[in-house]
Amino acid sequence: IFECVFSCDIEKEGKPCKPKGEKKCSGGWKCKIKLCLKI
């Protein structure tokens, strides 16, 4: 579990949880209440 900002814009392994401009997290990540979770 990694903390993330409201926009879910964190980086994991060099890739953003949610690329800028995207409304949903990608790369196997999901944002839940300011947390980026691996799914």
UniProtKB/Swiss-Prot annotation:
Tissue specificity note: Expressed by the venom gland.
Print the keywords alphabetically: Calcium channel impairing toxin, Disulfide bond, Ion channel impairing toxin, Neurotoxin, Secreted, Toxin, Voltage-gated calcium channel impairing toxin
Q: Which InterPro entries match?
A: Hwtx-2-like
Name the chain's protein.
Omega-theraphotoxin-Asp1g
KW Metal-binding (keyword) present: no
Kindly give any further remark recorded in the entry.
The primary structure of the mature peptide is identical to that of venom protein 1 from Brachypelma smithi (AC P0DL80).
What is the role of this chain?
Answer: Inhibits voltage-gated calcium channels (Cav) in rat cerebellar granule cells. Has insecticidal activity.
The disulfides recorded in the entry are C4-C25, C8-C31, C17-C36
Q: Name one Pfam family in it.
A: Toxin_20
Location of the protein in the cell: Secreted
Presence of the UniProt keyword Protein biosynthesis in the record: no
GO cellular component, alphabetical, reads: extracellular region
Q: Which domain of life is it from?
A: Eukaryota
Q: Which GO terms describe its molecular function?
A: calcium channel regulator activity; toxin activity
